[in-house]
């Protein structure tokens, strides 16, 4: 049995807290507040409403058959939010107010679309949920044709080691 290839794409977003005041102390406070907002924003971006909105966009962009290779669907024909959430990893970039989004899927175009769809809807959902600051996209996700999993070399070496152990014993 062969493991299917998985592809990854990523995008970065910048959290900005602003007061409208422009001086050195206010700028330092804005940077500090932005770093504190990052975790709040990441929780908002993992919410079911955000996942459902991304799922709707994916259904508009891709054939349901292709999507079914990556996600499970509910009785209404929508992508299950939990199956979509499992494909997305959100992390902070150390000592910054940047958020890195990594999406992994069995199709490289879907992985990139997940990232780009998230960045397109994030400002609206963050504004509604938090009401403070903003989130901006730093770059756009690209389609990477090189699979990130399974690691063929690692799996081959592990298989050879296991076979060697069986032969030796």
What is each model feature region?
Residues 1-169:
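Hydrophobic and amphipathic membrane-targeting/association helices
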């Amino acid at each position: 049995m062969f493991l299917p290839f998985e592809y990854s794409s990523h995008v970065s977003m910048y959290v900005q807290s602003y007061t409208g005041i422009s001086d050195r102390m206010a700028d330092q406070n804005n940077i500090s507040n932005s770093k504190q907002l990052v975790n709040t924003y990441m929780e908002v971006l993992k919410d079911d409403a955000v996942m459902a909105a991304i799922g709707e966009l994916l259904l508009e962009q891709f054939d349901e058959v292709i999507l079914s290779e990556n996600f499970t669907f509910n009785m209404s024909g929508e992508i299950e939010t939990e199956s979509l959430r499992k494909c997305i990893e959100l992390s902070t970039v150390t000592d910054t107010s940047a958020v890195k989004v990594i999406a992994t899927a069995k199709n490289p175009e879907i992985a990139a679309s997940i990232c780009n769809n998230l960045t397109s809807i994030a400002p609206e959902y963050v504004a509604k949920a938090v009401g403070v600051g903003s989130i901006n996209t730093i770059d756009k996700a690209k389609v990477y044709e090189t699979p990130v999993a399974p690691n063929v070399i690692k799996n081959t070496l592990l298989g050879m080691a296991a076979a060697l152990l069986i032969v030796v014993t």
